[in-house]
């Protein structure tokens, strides 16, 4: 039960994990798919042209980090959806529905929970208070150097874990769909990722994400329509026929089959819910619009697109039960699905649209990874150049040219590191990194952002101790947990018995921040509390906020 639970969770906790087997089992390499290769090359050619176009319009620091603030709310909503909707969601959740039925819907809802928090509590204030990174907001009335250092470290740890998982996921996915060598796939993704961000900055990254979102939504919509057409657009027929052909029968319509440990499930739920609001590459997108109103519209549109997409994956999963499961064309000699369960959506694409549509869906799956790694790389580069170099090392006195140069050097270094780690971790089960990334975002980044915006008694001392406490607790508990302590290090029993640390590390972060703030009687602390009123006025009105260019 534990193994089943873990392999299920590894499918969809992050956009990086585009496949179950890539992380938890054998990868079945597919024959070279020429149509998929052609469509992928068309996508790459188009996005490289966009990068060239964007490079001509990226002249300043604001252009590079935020596309000059000229992205509309609708465009940014699509881009956020493109950054968030993943190959993991498309292949992973549909695979879970194919294998276990109703439980897949529960996990897809888990991804949506965090967006109302961003919509109602974070988006507008973040846009009014910040400029390029969420550290601008966290350090608004606190001491710049320690807070920016903490925020940058939290961002870089999340980005690094995300990138490792993305690169391993990319290599395995391309091996599955295209038949290419794993190392070739990882190097290819790394090179494209660097090109997009190095030359096109946020403008190129945004349009890559928009194109990917449109392709993914279009492809998934077509698949869902074809599935519903096969049952005369009757959901009762879809579910009743699926129950008849599925080996588990009626149990696929019941929830709870994948939950073996309530504490781990609760901890994962907290990480997903609050970690989303602490992901640096998602938060960075709110600075690409002109004002708080457009930021709010961005989240509204993004939530709509993402919610619609997860409904589609549920239909696609049941469609695979109905149209792929009984079809021996998609099975091997042992009766198992070719390529593993996570190929269910890809086989369904073949079943409803033939080889041409199969090629399109394969290319879309690869495009999802390119869109996400581009956003991650830019978030990591901005944390180094804007937060660490310009604000900490140069104490806010760096010139724009030097800051951009540092950012671009960081992009190249991140690309090389991502390729190296992707190759290094090829044989590893890296699912634990996914849980750790969300847990760190929820335990370090989220508490700092939310408390700094809403609590007038916060001081630098409280934020520093609470933030580092959350970050270190998440890492230590993950190391002492069953995945690393037992599976990787080979000990008999874990010291920390649960899969995810967020339940405890978040509590540590919030309590630490609260306690060390209220006990801070220093003059600096008193001054920081007095500055809350001016921060509150700006966060509500936008007076003095950085403005984007004209749309």
From Swiss-Prot:
<feature type="transmembrane region" description="Helical">
    <location>
        <begin position="469"/>
        <end position="489"/>
    </location>
</feature>
<feature type="transmembrane region" description="Helical">
    <location>
        <begin position="5"/>
        <end position="25"/>
    </location>
</feature>
<feature type="transmembrane region" description="Helical">
    <location>
        <begin position="207"/>
        <end position="227"/>
    </location>
</feature>
<feature type="transmembrane region" description="Helical">
    <location>
        <begin position="356"/>
        <end position="376"/>
    </location>
</feature>
<feature type="transmembrane region" description="Helical">
    <location>
        <begin position="104"/>
        <end position="124"/>
    </location>
</feature>
<dbReference type="InterPro" id="IPR050277">
    <property type="entry name" value="Sodium:Solute_Symporter"/>
</dbReference>
<dbReference type="Pfam" id="PF00474">
    <property type="entry name" value="SSF"/>
</dbReference>
<dbReference type="GO" id="GO:0015123">
    <property type="term" value="F:acetate transmembrane transporter activity"/>
</dbReference>
<keyword id="KW-0472">Membrane</keyword>
<feature type="transmembrane region" description="Helical">
    <location>
        <begin position="304"/>
        <end position="324"/>
    </location>
</feature>
<dbReference type="InterPro" id="IPR014083">
    <property type="entry name" value="Cation/Ac_symporter_ActP"/>
</dbReference>
<keyword id="KW-1003">Cell membrane</keyword>
<feature type="transmembrane region" description="Helical">
    <location>
        <begin position="34"/>
        <end position="54"/>
    </location>
</feature>
<dbReference type="InterPro" id="IPR001734">
    <property type="entry name" value="Na/solute_symporter"/>
</dbReference>
<comment type="similarity">
    <text>Belongs to the sodium:solute symporter (SSF) (TC 2.A.21) family.</text>
</comment>
<keyword id="KW-0812">Transmembrane</keyword>
<dbReference type="GO" id="GO:0006847">
    <property type="term" value="P:plasma membrane acetate transport"/>
</dbReference>
<feature type="transmembrane region" description="Helical">
    <location>
        <begin position="430"/>
        <end position="450"/>
    </location>
</feature>
<keyword id="KW-0739">Sodium transport</keyword>
<dbReference type="GO" id="GO:0043879">
    <property type="term" value="F:glycolate transmembrane transporter activity"/>
</dbReference>
<dbReference type="GO" id="GO:0006814">
    <property type="term" value="P:sodium ion transport"/>
</dbReference>
<keyword id="KW-0997">Cell inner membrane</keyword>
<feature type="transmembrane region" description="Helical">
    <location>
        <begin position="406"/>
        <end position="426"/>
    </location>
</feature>
<protein>
    <recommendedName>
        <fullName>Cation/acetate symporter ActP</fullName>
    </recommendedName>
</protein>
<keyword id="KW-0813">Transport</keyword>
<keyword id="KW-0769">Symport</keyword>
<feature type="transmembrane region" description="Helical">
    <location>
        <begin position="184"/>
        <end position="204"/>
    </location>
</feature>
<dbReference type="InterPro" id="IPR018212">
    <property type="entry name" value="Na/solute_symporter_CS"/>
</dbReference>
<keyword id="KW-0406">Ion transport</keyword>
<dbReference type="GO" id="GO:0005886">
    <property type="term" value="C:plasma membrane"/>
</dbReference>
<keyword id="KW-1133">Transmembrane helix</keyword>
<comment type="function">
    <text>Transports acetate.</text>
</comment>
<feature type="transmembrane region" description="Helical">
    <location>
        <begin position="263"/>
        <end position="283"/>
    </location>
</feature>
<dbReference type="GO" id="GO:0015293">
    <property type="term" value="F:symporter activity"/>
</dbReference>
<feature type="transmembrane region" description="Helical">
    <location>
        <begin position="150"/>
        <end position="170"/>
    </location>
</feature>
<feature type="transmembrane region" description="Helical">
    <location>
        <begin position="498"/>
        <end position="518"/>
    </location>
</feature>
<dbReference type="InterPro" id="IPR038377">
    <property type="entry name" value="Na/Glc_symporter_sf"/>
</dbReference>
<keyword id="KW-0915">Sodium</keyword>
<feature type="transmembrane region" description="Helical">
    <location>
        <begin position="77"/>
        <end position="97"/>
    </location>
</feature>
């Amino acid at each position: 039960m534990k193994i089943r639970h873990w392999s299920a969770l590894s499918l969809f906790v992050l956009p990086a994990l585009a496949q179950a087997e890539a992380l938890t089992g054998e990868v079945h390499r597919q024959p070279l798919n020429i149509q998929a290769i052609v469509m992928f090359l068309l996508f790459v050619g188009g996005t490289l042209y966009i990068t060239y176009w964007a490079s001509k319009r990226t002249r300043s620091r604001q252009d590079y980090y935020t596309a000059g603030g000229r992205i509309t709310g609708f465009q940014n909503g699509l881009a956020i959806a493109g950054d968030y909707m993943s190959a993991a969601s498309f292949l992973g959740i549909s695979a879970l529905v194919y294998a276990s039925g109703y439980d897949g819907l529960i996990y897809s809802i888990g991804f949506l929970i965090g967006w109302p928090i961003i919509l109602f509590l974070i988006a507008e204030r973040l846009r009014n208070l910040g400029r390029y990174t969420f550290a601008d907001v966290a350090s608004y009335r606190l001491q710049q150097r320690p807070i920016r250092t903490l925020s940058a470290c939290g961002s870089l740890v999340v980005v690094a874990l995300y990138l490792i998982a993305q690169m391993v996921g990319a290599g395995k996915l391309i091996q599955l769909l295209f038949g290419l060598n794993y190392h070739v796939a990882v190097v290819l993704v790394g090179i494209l990722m660097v090109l997009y961000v190095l030359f096109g900055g946020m403008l190129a990254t945004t349009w890559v994400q928009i194109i990917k979102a449109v392709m993914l939504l279009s492809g998934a919509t077509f698949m869902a329509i074809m599935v519903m057409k096969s049952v005369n657009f009757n959901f009762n027929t879809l579910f009743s026929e699926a129950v008849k052909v599925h080996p588990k029968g009626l149990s696929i319509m019941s929830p709870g089959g994948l939950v073996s440990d309530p504490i781990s499930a609760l901890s994962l739920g907290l990480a997903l819910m609050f970690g989303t609001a602490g992901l640096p590459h998602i938060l960075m997108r709110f600075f690409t619009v002109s004002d708080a109103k457009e930021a709010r519209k961005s989240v509204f549109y993004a939530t709509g697109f993402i919610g619609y997409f997860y409904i589609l994956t549920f239909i696609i999963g049941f469609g695979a039960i109905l149209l792929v499961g009984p079809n021996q064309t998609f099975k091997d000699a042992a009766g198992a699905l070719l390529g593993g369960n996570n190929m269910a959506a890809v086989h369904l694409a073949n079943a409803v649209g033939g080889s041409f549509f199969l090629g399109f869906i394969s290319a879309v799956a690869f495009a999802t990874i390119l869109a996400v790694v581009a956003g991650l790389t830019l978030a990591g580069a901005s944390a180094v150049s804007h937060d660490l170099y310009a604000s900490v090392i140069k104490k806010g006195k760096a010139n724009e040219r030097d800051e951009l140069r540092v950012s671009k050097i960081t992009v190249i270094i991140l690309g090389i590191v991502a390729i190296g780690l992707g190759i290094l971790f090829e044989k590893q089960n890296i699912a634990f990194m996914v849980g750790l990334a969300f847990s760190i975002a929820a335990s370090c980044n989220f508490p700092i952002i939310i408390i700094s915006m809403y609590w007038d008694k916060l001081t630098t001392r409280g934020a520093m101790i609470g933030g580092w406490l959350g970050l270190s607790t998440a890492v230590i508990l993950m190391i002492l947990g069953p995945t690393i302590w037992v599976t990787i290090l080979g000990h008999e029993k874990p010291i920390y018995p649960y899969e995810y640390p967020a339940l405890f590390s978040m509590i540590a972060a919030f309590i630490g921040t609260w306690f060390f703030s209220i006990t801070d009687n220093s003059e600096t602390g008193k001054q920081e509390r007095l500055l809350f009123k001016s921060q509150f006025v700006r966060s509500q009105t936008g007076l003095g906020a950085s403005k984007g260019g004209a749309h």
